[in-house]
From Swiss-Prot:
Record's protein name: Copper chaperone for superoxide dismutase
Organism of this sequence: Rattus norvegicus (Rat)
Modification comment: Ubiquitinion by XIAP/BIRC4 leads to enhancement of its chaperone activity toward its physiologic target, SOD1, rather than proteasomal degradation. XIAP/BIRC4 preferentially ubiquitinates at Lys-241.
UniProt KW keywords: Chaperone, Copper, Cytoplasm, Disulfide bond, Isopeptide bond, Metal-binding, Phosphoprotein, Ubl conjugation, Zinc
Cofactor note: Binds 2 copper ions per subunit. Binds 1 zinc ion per subunit.
Length: 274
């Protein structure tokens, strides 16, 4: 189920590269993170600018804490609290409007998958979030197919036994239009969704409990606002890259730029929380 910051959940490990050059940098990072609710353990390695955090907070919130010290931070990898790499993936979400975000998938154990991320540009309120069958964005989000449903079940809520495997329930957007969420799911597996797509919808998912004809099909959550292909991503200590081999940008230069396209060559803009 989706949880807000400080609501607990299963611990995971987040690996960041942080711009640190001296012991005072290390001290500032320790002081900021160790006083934060939801952070259990912090390891800082100045020599390779690495910060390893054991936490129940979404990665975006940990990154914001790190950058509140005045230092840039980039998430490099995720893993279970036992520092095991059981599978990780990421979806970069975009649509025809202003909605955009990044959502990450992490297999915490063979029985539990973590889905966490931040989506901006939403109307305040609840929005349905689902894994869809196809990773096909040729017609924007309309070509992603139906909800991922290999069991042939009816649409339901994330806590239901009888549900589409891609049914992740709702995420809540604040007045700013931002939804930051952390979902733990017992049916979804990272290795089953790589190459598929993640879609956020215009309205609230009724979890199959409404009286609308689409309740048991889509949750009657309205049109698809933004989507992204779910791609394999780095686990802990699997991403040593400091410079992109494709265009020579450092991890600091490419921060806040698109992964590809003309905008990647433009001067860096303040990151849209991604």
């Amino acid at each position: 189920m989706a949880s807000k910051s400080g609501d607990g959940g299963t611990m995971c490990a987040l690996e960041f590269t942080v711009q640190m050059s001296c012991q005072s940098c290390v001290d500032a990072v320790h002081k900021t993170l160790k006083g934060a609710a939801g952070v259990q353990n912090v390891e800082v390695q100045l020599e390779n600018q690495m910060v390893l955090v054991q936490t129940t907070l979404p990665s975006q919130e940990v990154q914001a804490l790190l950058e509140s010290t005045g230092r840039q931070a980039v998430l490099k990898g995720m893993g279970s609290s036992q520092l095991k790499n059981l599978g990780a993936a990421v979806a970069i979400m975009e649509g025809s409007g202003t909605v955009q975000g990044v959502v990450r998938f992490l297999q915490l154990s063979s029985e539990l998958c973590l889905i966490e991320g931040t989506i901006d540009g939403l109307e305040p309120g609840l929005h349905g979030l689902h894994v869809h069958q196809y990773g096909d964005l040729t017609k924007d989000c309309s070509s992603c197919g139906d909800h991922f449903n290999p069991d042939g079940a009816s649409h339901g809520g994330p806590q239901d036994t009888d549900r589409h495997r891609g049914d992740l329930g709702n995420v809540h957007a604040e007045a700013s239009g931002r939804a930051t969420f952390r979902i733990e799911d017992k049916q979804l597996k990272v290795w089953d969704v790589i190459g598929r797509s993640l879609v956020v919808d215009e309205g609230e998912d009724d979890l199959g409990r409404g009286g609308h004809p689409l309740s048991k099909v889509t949750g009657n959550s309205g049109k698809r606002l933004a989507c992204g292909i779910i791609a394999r991503s780095a686990g802990l200590f699997q991403n040593p890259k400091q410079i992109c081999s494709c265009d020579g940008l450092t991890i600091w230069e490419e921060r806040g730029r698109p992964i590809a396209g003309q905008g990647r060559k433009d001067s860096a803009q303040p990151p849209a929380h991604l």
